[in-house]
Every structure is written in C-alpha cells, then in structure tokens.
Amino acid sequence: MLQHARFEHWIAAPLDQVFQFFGNPQNLPRLMPPWMQVKLKDVKIVPPADLPSGNFAGTGSTVGASYRVLPGLPFRTSSVARITAFEFNHYFEDVQEKGPFKTWHHRHEFAPEVRDGVNGTLVIDQVQYDPGLGALGKIGNALFIAPQMQKTFCHRQLALEEIVHSGKLTQSG
C-alpha cells in the first residue's frame, strides 16, 4: 500500500547555495543520522546539460548507498536511487531502483521564502513509498518505518541548520 510523507523546513540561506548542497550526492552522509553510517558507493553523475558547472546530479544520475536501517541493529542494507527529474534551483526527484522498499519516490523541492524579513529557502521533501509485504509491511510501516523516517528527516533539518551556521554549506562531502 502506497504511503505518503511530507516534510518542510525553512533555512536562512540563499536558494542557490541550498540547492547546490542538496544537488550534490556527496553531501548526503552529512545530513543523515550518524548511527546510520551512510556510505556512498557507485555514484554516477550525469550533469544537467543546461548548467555550465557544478556537481549536480541531473536526470539519469544514480546514487548507490549502504546504511544501517535501525539504531542498534548490526546489519546494513543498500539502495540505488536514480534521478528522474531535475529543474535547477526548483526541484529534483529520485526513485529507488534497488533497495528495501517495493517502491520509493522522493521529490526534493526548493523555493525562496522571506520570513521575518530574512531571506531564506523553504525545503520540501515529499516521499511516496510502499514497504511491500502486504499486511506485514503495513504493520512494519506503522511501528518502525514511518516513525524512523520522521526521526531521520528531523535529524536532516537539524544537521542542515548546523551546516549553515558553521559556514560549511558551500563545502561538499
């Protein structure tokens, strides 16, 4: 059964810098909880044709990663995501080609937004996924997957704040 999750976060940083950070897959481990021990492997970048430079993962790029699924568990899983859509400084989308879910579609959206007179960027993550396994997957989603996803995206928001405040948003990897 298809599940939906949406996460929003406003950050006091320019749209172009935030998009550049998220558009570079080497930054993914910096956003993830340390216990996940995310390791990138077999990253194949297809630069967007209309951009002169940058480390953006355009349409057709693939990102392989291995990571721990739940805190305290010793085993790792791996996944491969393919970028299926990319519009510079607006959004990009990835789908799981290989991994733990029956289906996974993640849309990353970015929009300039002023709050309390401060220029910033609204980051929106929309995820549609199916854990598979029928009724067992539905129970697993309610007990483990959805709560862990909520915690992971909360961590991503805190990590992004820390990266911005430390002045390291424009550094990669």
List the model feature ranges, each with a label.
Residues 1-52:
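Hydrophobic ligand-binding cavity/cleft-lining segments
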Residues 11-13, 67-71, 85-87, 100, ...:
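Beta-strand elements of well-folded, non-transmembrane domains
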Residues 4-6, 76-80, 102-106:
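Short, surface-exposed coil-to-beta transition loops
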